[in-house]
A protein has these predicted regions:
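Class I Rossmann-like S-adenosyl-L-methionine
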Residues: 1-142
Length: 142
């Protein structure tokens, strides 16, 4: 299981009401991971939680309701990496599509298309949101 799959599991547990700090501490105590891996998991996990309103807004603009929690978490992680981290676009898109292929080739292609479209549109999108709604841009509940 790779790091993104583990982050997906952590986010699913968080959505069930478990405390983020407890989840992360338990994960680190039960798994042997390097310092860079720990930093990556921490950044992505807390980053997705911190920007949940923004990420869900962007996902819902490009997809109908994503029914599978796993895929929604995967999109959240990938959108976060594309927007807030200096992650290589090709790597994020490829890894997202590969993880989604567990649900079938068509799902992998769907995720690939959604991520590529978002990457092309994100700069204009961020400017547009900045002008329209700071609550969405900064994930501040209204």
């Amino acid at each position: 299981m790779n790091l993104k799959e583990r982050i997906i599991e952590l986010l699913e547990e968080f959505e069930k009401g478990k405390y983020s700090n407890v989840l992360l501490n338990d994960y680190f105590n039960k798994n042997k991971i390097t310092a860079p891996e720990k930093a990556f998991v921490t950044e992505v996990f807390y980053g997705v939680i911190r920007n949940l309103i923004f990420l869900d807004y962007e996902i819902e603009k490009r997809t109908k309701k994503v029914k599978k929690s796993y895929l929604k978490q995967l999109l959240r992680i990938s959108f976060y990496q594309l927007t807030f981290m200096n992650s290589e676009t090709k790597a994020v898109v490829w890894e997202g599509a590969e993880l989604a292929k567990k649900y079938g080739d068509a799902i992998g292609k769907f995720i690939n298309g959604v991520l590529r479209t978002y990457d092309r549109e994100k700069e204009a999108e961020l400017k547009d949101i900045e002008n329209k709604s700071w609550a969405i841009r900064y994930s501040y509940p209204e």
